[in-house]
Amino acid sequence: IIKPSSEKSIFDLNKKKIVSIFKKKGVIIFKGFKINKSNVTKFTDIFTKQYANDAIRRNNRFKDKNLHDVDPGNYEMPLHSEASYSTSWPEIVWFYCNKAPKKSGQTTLCDGRAIYKNFNLDLKNFFLKNQILYDIIIPFKANKANPKIIKRTKNLRPWHIEYPGIYDCYINLKNNYLKYKLKKYALVKTRESDKVAFVNHLQIILNRDPQVLNMTLENNKKISKKIMDEIKKISNELTV
């Protein structure tokens, strides 16, 4: 947690020191700074080379193309890595709360390296060996694809995305969406620490994220309940 130690603004912080802390800790909370909502991206621009595309369903905030709402509602939001199934998977996620609620609304955090470290040998070997197969739909215009239309093959044209793991890709120009399959590991090797981390969307509740139609192993089999229960147990113990 970084708090102001004087009357200086958040823009006076030492960039190199902030980057160094972030590389070491993986998460920073800037607390107590006076920052206007119109200056949020002025600050994030200092540390951001490029902004990833967000889901079309999320509205812009404060007339800023790089600021978006989170999904509204009271649904449970299981642990996941933002957009891990897309070509726009971000390296950094910024959160800004303009008016904090008095109760609930917290963003959960968990270190994927710690999750993997706490896996037993069998579980580590399982995910080192097996890739996850995602069925994905990505709307690319504001008139989002109707779920009833998604299951049809009419108006689908073969498409191509140059991204390792994506195949069976199709585009629907009438209803403005892409459909594809993505194979990728549930594990990644982190750039800074050079350690393996458990980072994926395996714990989401299907039908809550409209872009993920299905998830299986690459042989089309479901991950066993025993494995999923162990993942959830370890993740819950490490989530703050």
Regions found by a protein language model. Give the residues of each.
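N-terminal non-catalytic cap/leader segment that marks the start of a structured domain
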Residues: 1-83
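Active-site environment of non-heme Fe oxygenases that use a 2-His-1-carboxylate facial triad
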Residues: 1-10, 17, 62-66, 73-79, ...
